[in-house]
Amino acid sequence: MLNALGVIVSGRLVQTDFQQISDSHFLITIPDADNVNHVVVFLTGTTPFPDGMAGGVYFSWPDPNAPPNWQLLGYISNTKPSAIFKISQLKKLDEIAGQSTMMNNVFGSNLPISHIAQIGVSIEPESSLVQQTPSTTTSSTYYQFGQKIVENFFNFVSSFSITQSQMTPAPNETFVPLSTVQTWYTNFERRLQQNPNFWKN
């Protein structure tokens, strides 16, 4: 199966150098993954999956201080030999931002940190993978619904905004700066883009 799998990252050469971890698990490293938004995982056509089996495609950002956190992206099979997966919403943006100061003063300059990602393919029963694969339609619907609610709320609150000089004393009213609502809106939208189901937790 080693030569049967490939990965394409936009603007880069095709990668087929999967490492075999076990009889049914294969792993490949994606260097400089910070700016990668989508990956294509495909069968090269040299060896098909056994009947009834498919390749579950998993994604992980390796962390030296924690065990791997694998996330199922979807699957490929003999009848669906390639798939495009969006990984940008899976990135640990907060951790990347927090680590950006670690490379200061190397050779007298600030150098960007290079992060790697890993993609694993696990040979599993196709029926099981079909049931586990997240529905992009549902995720997209949640995202659109959440975004509309947030936009509606922000527009509603903004319609009542006044400057401090326009305010009249109202001891029974509580005022919230519009900038605070804007910050909340920005954070909520970012979290919604990363994971449309984050609000369920």
From Swiss-Prot:
Highest taxon, organism lineage: Eukaryota
Pfam families: Hikeshi-like_C, Hikeshi-like_N
Annotated InterPro entries: Hikeshi-like_C, Hikeshi-like_N, OPI10
Alphabetical GO biological process terms: protein import into nucleus
Gene Ontology MF term list: Hsp70 protein binding; nuclear import signal receptor activity
Any one of the GO CC terms: nucleus
Family of the protein in this entry: Belongs to the OPI10 family.
Protein known as: Protein OPI10 homolog
Species of provenance: Anopheles gambiae
